[in-house]
């Protein structure tokens, strides 16, 4: 298997964790390259559920090496909690198997506080942040006042960096948001309490990956969130704080762009979104509730109910353009079972015309476009016992083939249930 980048093709929650888990069987390394614990990847193995926020899904496979790259922002306490949870489940998370970049930035307590007070103070436009401190951490990274994992090795320097960061933060907290002054020593002590658990994992992960490529090892790059949450190319400002598209696999892990050969987009059979932002095909009726309940559409990170809607091929084609997907994996096809009719959005109505691309202005996407649907017949019986393409109902096959026709990319993996073995592989 060639080196593969796995990207969520919608607004996140597409089922990337399951697909990464499946493909890990044929790989040697699994790499997280962006985002933080605002992402939740759910993997079900033999009826047992694992929810991973920071550690790559490949950790569930023995002898696979997992890497958290420089593009990730890491909450020390959440990282340790995740380690302990996996240990309690009998999973090997030793430093021999899990590597953490020395360049990874740390989410500090003041980042989480700033995230929360900002969202609470907003009266006009709430982004729907998870409040995990992801955005403020990336802000400090760009402002060159961030704290990196390597700083844990030099406590005196770390303390000075915390003091520097808090000069501005405390002005914001006390004068703009009317919250309490944050003490540098308190923050320092809290962070240093985690150092002994984190330091053994620190590695030059870029060099490790380069060595892996030289030895012809196989690598999966595991994306978080989804294309349309990308800070540059998503539905701004209702986006995350990092680049979620495939090109960032190179930057966020410290490897050459030419190191990746296959890019797989993960797309749900319908569309979901968490938090605020444009959602052209959103359903407010009983069908939307049907998808939400049958699909268990509640966030793995926040528990918030996900907004649900029909498949949007306009947005999916945009994802194909931005990432250069070589193939797609379609998840949760089984959720559509029982619907007599299934709508699929192939274009938007805008100013009396039919357009097949998303408007760049989020106001237009929010208020001025209407989805144009094709209606396809649904299917009644469950798909969960299907083990091959030939066993799928003809209407389900037609649905899959119509998606392929419109976006121009083959669907090679089809998920028909939550468990690892409820997956069909299709040679095209």
From Swiss-Prot:
UniProt subcellular location: Cytoplasm
Residues given in the record as Mg(2+) binding sites: 13, 40
Reactions mediated catalytically: IMP + L-aspartate + GTP = N(6)-(1,2-dicarboxyethyl)-AMP + GDP + phosphate + 2 H(+)
Any Gene Ontology biological process: IMP metabolic process
Keyword Cytoplasm among UniProt keywords: yes
A GO MF term: GTP binding
Residues binding substrate, per UniProt: 300-306
Catalytic residue list: 13, 41
CDD domains with a match to the protein in the record: AdSS
Cofactor: Mg(2+)
InterPro entries: Adenylosuccin_syn_GTP-bd, Adenylosuccin_syn_Lys_AS, Adenylosuccinate_synth_dom1, Adenylosuccinate_synth_dom2, Adenylosuccinate_synth_dom3, Adenylosuccinate_synthetase, P-loop_NTPase
Superkingdom assignment: Bacteria
Cellular component terms per the entry's GO annotation: cytoplasm
Keywords: Cytoplasm, GTP-binding, Ligase, Magnesium, Metal-binding, Nucleotide-binding, Purine biosynthesis
Segments crossing the lipid bilayer: none
Binding residues for IMP: 13-16, 38-41, 130, 144, 225, 240, 304
Residues that coordinate or bind GTP: 12-18, 40-42, 306, 332-334, 415-417
Top EC category: ligase
Note on how the cofactor is bound: Binds 1 Mg(2+) ion per subunit.
Pathway annotation: Purine metabolism; AMP biosynthesis via de novo pathway; AMP from IMP: step 1/2
Catalytic activity, EC: 6.3.4.4
Main location: cytoplasm
Family label: Belongs to the adenylosuccinate synthetase family.
Subunit structure: Homodimer.
Known role: Plays an important role in the de novo pathway of purine nucleotide biosynthesis. Catalyzes the first committed step in the biosynthesis of AMP from IMP.
The protein, known as: Adenylosuccinate synthetase
Originating species: Lawsonia intracellularis (strain PHE/MN1-00)
